[in-house]
Amino acid sequence: MLITGLIIGCLLIGLVIGYVVRQHQHRQELLAVQKQARDIIASATAETQQKIAKLTADSRRETLTYQQSVKDELAEQTSDIAVREQRRQQREQLLGQMGVRLADQTAILDERSQANRDQRQKIRDLKAQALQLRTDRDEMLAQQAGIDEQAAKDHVLADTELDLKRDRDVEIKALNDNAVANAERWAKDVVLSATESGPQDLPKEHLEHTVTVPNGEIRSKIIGRDGQHIRLLETLTGTDLIFVPDDNTTLFISTHDPIRREVARVALTNLVASRRISSNQIETQVENAQRDVNHSLWETGEQTVSGLHVGWMHPDLMKLIGRLKYRTSYGQNVLLHSIEVAQLTGAMAARLGYNTRLARRAGLLHDLGKAIDHEVEGTHVEIGTEFAQKYGEDDVVINAIAAHHGDVEKTSPLAELVAAADAISGARPGARSESVEDYINRLRALEKIANDQSGVAESYAIQAGRELRIIVKPQELDDTAAANLTQEVAQQIESTLTYPGKIKVTTIRKSTAVEYVGDEKKKKSKKKKKKAANA
C-alpha cells in the first residue's frame, strides 16, 4: 500500500516537473519566435525602405527624363509649326501670283474667244458665199450644157470612176507582171535560205532486221526442242524468225509490221544476253519488250514535239509520231523526213511572215498516216487526215496533210509550203535509197516508156533516174511533134511509175548534113595534067 502511494506520488511529482519543464520550453520557444519575428520585421522594414528609396529615385529620374522628352517634343513641334507657317505664307503668296496670272490668261482667252467667234462668223459668211457661187456656177453650167445638175454630177462621177478603174488596172497589171517576173527568183531565194538555215543534219539510223546469236548453244536454246521455243516467239511477236542459211549466227526477223519487228528484236536481244531461254522467260521478255517499245514510241513522239516547239499535242498523236521512227519510205526514215519537212516549212514560213509554229506542226504531221497505213485501210494521206480531224487539229494542218500529194486543193499558203518542203526533203541527194534491183528496174521502166513512142531512136535514164533524155529521128518528127512527145512521156511516167522527187524529161532532135568538097576535083585535075604531059 505504501509502495503504491510512493509510486503515485512519484508520478504526480514527475507530472508536475514535466509540466514546469514544458512551460519553460514553451516560453523559451515563444521568446525565440518573437525575436525571429522582430528580426524579420526589422529586415522587411529595412528592405521596404530601400525599395521605397530606389523607387523614389527611379520615379524622380523617369520624371526628369519625361519632362526633358516633352520639352524636346514641344520644341520640335514648335519648329515644325514655324516651318509650316512659313510654307503657308509662301503658298498664299504663290496663290496670289497664280491668281494674277489666271486673271491675265482669262483676259487673253476672252480676247481669243472673241477673235475665234469673229473668225467663225467670217468662215460661215465665206461658206455661204462659196455655196452661192457654186450654185450660180452649176446653174450657169447647166444652162450652157443643156443638162441638169444631177446629170452633170453623174457624168463627172462616171468619168472619175472610169479613170480610177483604169489606174487601178494598170497598177494591178504592173504588180502582177513584177510578181510573175520575180516569182521564181523569190521562191528560189526563200527555198535556198530555208535549206541553208532550216533543217539540221540528223544521223541516219539503221533499222536492224537481224539478231546475232553468239554460238550454237544459244541457237539451240532459241529453237528449242522440236522448234517449240522459236514457234512460241513467232506466235507472241507475230513475226517469222529465219536463220540465214549460210550463217547460223544470224537470225533474220521477217514481218511487214515494223513495231512487231522491233518487239521481236528487243526480246531476242535480251534473251541472248541473259542466256536463260525457256518458255516462261520467252513470255516474260516479250511482255517486257512490248512495254519498253510502247514507252519508247510515246517518249520519241514527246521529244520530237518538244524539240520542234509545235505546242501541246494529243498523246495518241505523239505515239503515232514515235511509230514513224520504225517506218521507212524509199530507204528514208519517215520520222527524220517529217522532222526535216517541219524544219524546212518553219524556215520558209518565217521568211514569208506566216505562223511558224503552225507551219512546223503541219510539216511534222504531213506523213502521220504512214505510221499505221499497214494496219488501216486507205492511203497514208487519207489516214493522216482522218486522225488529224479526230484529235482536233487546226483546219490549216488538216488541209496540208490532205493536199501535200495534190489529192485535194490547197486552201492555205502553209499547205503549199508543206508540199514544197516534202519534195525538197525527198529529192535531196542521199535522202532516199532503194535496192539495186529496184533501181535498175526503175531505169529500165523509164527507158521503156520512151522507147515505146514512135519516132524515138534511143533513150537514156541518167542522173540516177532523175533525168530521161530521148533522142528522136529528125526525119520522122518535127519540132512540134518532139515537144508533144516530151509531154506525153512525162504524163505516162507520172501516171504509171512511182518515183522519189522529180524527173526531168529532155527530148533531143538533131539533124546533121555532111558534104565533102575538093578531093575528087583535085584527082581529076591531076589526071588531066598527066595526060597532057604524056602527050
UniProtKB/Swiss-Prot annotation:
The segment(s) forming the HD domain are 334-427
Q: Name one GO cellular component term.
A: plasma membrane
What residue range is the signal peptide? none
Q: Which InterPro entries match?
A: Diverse_Catalytic_Enzymes, HD/PDEase_dom, HD_domain, HDIG_dom, KH_dom, KH_dom_type_1, KH_dom_type_1_sf, Ribonuclease_Y
GO molecular function list = RNA binding; RNA endonuclease activity
Does the entry feature the keyword Cell division, yes or no?
no
Please name the SMART domains in this protein's record.
Answer: HDc (SM00471), KH (SM00322)
Q: Which UniProt keywords apply?
A: Cell membrane, Endonuclease, Hydrolase, Membrane, Nuclease, RNA-binding, Transmembrane, Transmembrane helix
Lineage, top-rank taxon, reads Bacteria
Q: Return the EC number.
A: 3.1.-.-
Q: Where are the transmembrane segments?
A: 1-21
**Family the UniProt entry places it in:** Belongs to the RNase Y family.
Name it: Ribonuclease Y 2
